[in-house]
Amino acid sequence: MSSKETRRRFLEAAGIAGVAALAGCSGNGGGDGGDTETEGDGGTATEDGGDSGGDTSTRLSWHAGGTGGTYYPLSNEFKTIVEANTDYTLNVQSTGASVENVGSLSDGSADFALIQNDIAYFAKNGTGIETFEGNAIENLQGVATLYPETITIVTLESTGIETLSDLSGATINTGDLGSGTQVNANQILEAVGITDYNEQNAGFSQASEQLANGDIDAAFVVGGWPVGAIEDLATTNDVNIVSIEGDNRAAVKDAASWFADDTIPGGTYSGVSDPVETVAVQAMIATNSGVSAEAVENVTAAIFDNLDELTIKTDFITADSAQDGMSIELHEGAAAYFGE
């Protein structure tokens, strides 16, 4: 299927379904989708099938991402910290990430969620993605930014793809249909003048399988490095990470101001010894205006007062940088904690 036809399908479907339907979809909705194993709407069921129990006034729903990305394991570390330092219980839900999570925050089925800062901006302002055009999510509010969500273009050495220009005519997995990853991928390809490609749509783990099987030539992945699905792929295949640098990076940043410079360190993935220049968006914690100031401040304080208990993204998540790249209005509970 051509890239134009795939985008048309997405826009038509999005226009019909609207934002509300996103909360219930099972596809990957954002940069950190991975594989999803949802347990309903996230009210009381946790990813492993357990029940949170306890007082409903202290039970909070936290929507993460797919199990193959960074959002889900990081959210579970937040869960451990919050539950050890407050009276709140967090029900961490595996989801399709950013776009789906915005829908869940909008309808109140999620109290907190991890999303990309660009998707947050689109949703809050009713722009950027057809789903949000004229459907601004007015109750969406920010808590904290966390770490760069690196744009990783992964391929196998056997494809011969080494540069962005080599993607012309290729079969590319741009992420799940309607996801933040797909939005970012299409923005980047358009910005560098690549329009002739066959677009496939699937989550990170499935894209990894497609690469290994030779069904696609390259895949876009959006998430903090290292991404588990790419790590797994690199253990059994010779992978190549395509850089976004120089004039191409300048063109991408000119086309979309939320992209920032980023570098994947050499050695992050097996067989990729040199650093790879690319771009990134930001992962952030979001909530909705219906969550109390007390709950948001207490959860925020528990996390940022105990960052030494984290094992994921410890070089990036700090209280000092937690408002860098914040693209939407801050919740009053978060503002109280950060003194904004």
Predicted region positions:
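Terminal disorder- and signal-encoded targeting elements
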Residues: 1-131, 137-139, 144-145, 149-150, ...
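Short beta-strand and adjacent tight-turn residues that come in two discontinuous sequence segments
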Residues: 114-115, 220-222
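Short, ordered loop/turn segments at secondary-structure junctions
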Residues: 118, 177, 224
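Extracellular/periplasmic Venus flytrap/periplasmic-binding protein
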Residues: 175-190, 194-220
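Glycine-rich, charged/polar anion/phosphate-binding loops
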Residues: 205-206, 226-227, 269-272
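A short beta-strand structural signal in non-transmembrane regions
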Residues: 283-288
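Short solvent-exposed strand-capping/beta-turn motif centered on an Asx-Ser/Thr pair
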Residues: 290-292
